[in-house]
Amino acid sequence: MTMKMSYRKSNIYLSLVNSYMIDSPQPSSINYWWNMGSLLGLCLVIQICTGIFLAMHYSSNIELAFSSVEHIMRDVQYGWLIRYMHANGASFFFMCMYTHIAKGLYYGSYKSPRVTVWTVGVIIFVLTMAAAFLGYCCVYGQMSHWGATVITNLFSAIPFIGKDIVLWLWGGFSVSNPTIQRFFAFHYLVPFIIAAVVIMHMMALHTHGSSNPLGITGNLDRIPMHGYFVFKDLITVFVFMILFSLFVFYSPNTLGHPDNYIPGNPLVTPASIVPEWYLLPFYAILRSIPDKLLGVITMFAAILVLLVLPITDRSVVRGNSFKVLSKFFFFIFVFNFVLLGIIGMQHVEVPFVLIGQISTGIYFAYFIIIVPVISMIENVLFYIGRVSK
C-alpha cells in the first residue's frame, strides 16, 4: 500500500508555504523578541494596502498634493482611516524594526552562519528609510517641503558633481513639481522592492534557521512553526493591533509634526527643520559634524556600520545572554541611541551640539572599539573559567 503525501506538501506552490510557515523547524527556546519579524511583515502589508488606496485619490502635482491629502481626509469614504493607518503604520513599522535590530544586536543574530540574513536585513532598513523619506515629502506640508530641500541638498556636498546632482534630483532650481512627482513615483515603487528583498531575507533565514536566546545550535531541539509559534505570533499581533488602533482612532497625530498641516511654502522657513521621529538619531549624527561632506559621510556610515559587526565581534559565544560586560555596554548603546533621537529634535545650539558630538562618538565606538575589545576580554574570561574547572 502506497502512502499518499498531503496536498500541502505535494503541491509545488503550497509546499513552499508549508516549508516556511507550517513545518519549518524552529528552536524551542525562542522568546517573544523573535515575534518582531511577523509584526514587520504585518506592517509591510498594512503600508502597501493602504498606500495603494491612497494613491487612487492622491495627486502628485505640487499645486494639488496638499489639497488632495485633505480631500482624502474629508471627502473620500473612510479616507481619514486609510490615511491615519498609513501615517501611523510608518511609525509602528520603525518601532518594530528598531526592536528587531536591537534583538539582533543583543542575541548576536549577525554572526556566522547568518551573515547573509543580517546583510539583507540592513538593505531592507536602508530601503525602508528611503521609502519613509519619499512618502513624507509627498504630503507637501511645510515640513515636507523643507525636509526635502535639506536632505536633497546633502548631495551638493559631493565634490565637483554635487550641485549638478541636486539640480537633477529637483528637476529644476528648487523643490518643485517634478521633484514631488518623481518622489511619489519612487515612493510607490520602493515598498514592492522591499517586499522582494524581504523574500530574500526569509530565504537566507530558511537556509540555516533561526538563532535562539541561548546562542547555541538549535538543531537538537526544534519544533514545527505551525501550532506553536504561529499561535505565539498571533498573541503579539493582537497586542500590536490594539496599540495601533489606539493611535489611529484616538491619537492619530501624536507621532506626526504639526507644521505639516500647513501647505508647503518656500518663502517661509520653519523655526526648526526636523524629519519624522524615526529618522532623528541619524539626523542628529548629520548635524553633529560641522563639515557638510563629513556630516553626510558620517550619517550614511552610521547605517552601514551595522555591516561590520560580523567582523568586529570576535566572541566565541553568540549573543549577550551570558555576558555581563556585553549586556552593560549594549544598554549604554540603546540609551545613547535614544539620546541621539532627543538631540535631533533640538535646535542647533549649546549644549545640544556638544552632546550630539559625544553621542555620535559613543555610537561609532560601540561598533568599532567596544564590541571587539569586550568580546576579546570575555573570550579570555570564558577560557579561564573553562580551564579552572
UniProtKB/Swiss-Prot annotation:
InterPro entries documented for this protein: Cyt_b/b6_C (IPR005798), Cyt_b/b6_C_sf (IPR036150), Cyt_b/b6_N (IPR005797), Cytb/b6-like_sf (IPR027387), Cytochrome_b (IPR030689), Cytochrome_b_C_euk/bac (IPR048260), Cytochrome_b_N_euk/bac (IPR048259), Di-haem_cyt_TM (IPR016174)
Residues the record lists as binding a ubiquinone: 206
Protein name: Cytochrome b
Record bears the keyword Cytoplasm: no
GO CC terms of this entry: mitochondrial inner membrane; respiratory chain complex III
Note on cofactor: Binds 2 heme b groups non-covalently.
Domain of life of the organism encoding this protein: Eukaryota
Molecular-function GO terms, alphabetical: metal ion binding; ubiquinol-cytochrome-c reductase activity
Predominant subcellular localization, coarse grouping: mitochondrion
Residues passing through the membrane, by range: 36-56, 80-102, 117-137, 183-203, 229-249, 293-313, 325-345, 352-372
PROSITE patterns per record: CYTB_CTER (PS51003), CYTB_NTER (PS51002)
Residues annotated for heme b b562 binding in this entry: 86, 187
Family: Belongs to the cytochrome b family.
GO biological process entries: mitochondrial electron transport, ubiquinol to cytochrome c
Protein purpose: Component of the ubiquinol-cytochrome c reductase complex (complex III or cytochrome b-c1 complex) that is part of the mitochondrial respiratory chain. The b-c1 complex mediates electron transfer from ubiquinol to cytochrome c. Contributes to the generation of a proton gradient across the mitochondrial membrane that is then used for ATP synthesis.
Binding site for heme b b566: 100, 201
Subcellular location(s) of the protein: Mitochondrion inner membrane
The keyword Acyltransferase belongs to this UniProt entry's keyword annotation: no
Keywords: Electron transport, Heme, Iron, Membrane, Metal-binding, Mitochondrion, Mitochondrion inner membrane, Respiratory chain, Transmembrane, Transmembrane helix, Transport, Ubiquinone
Additional observations: Heme 1 (or BL or b562) is low-potential and absorbs at about 562 nm, and heme 2 (or BH or b566) is high-potential and absorbs at about 566 nm.
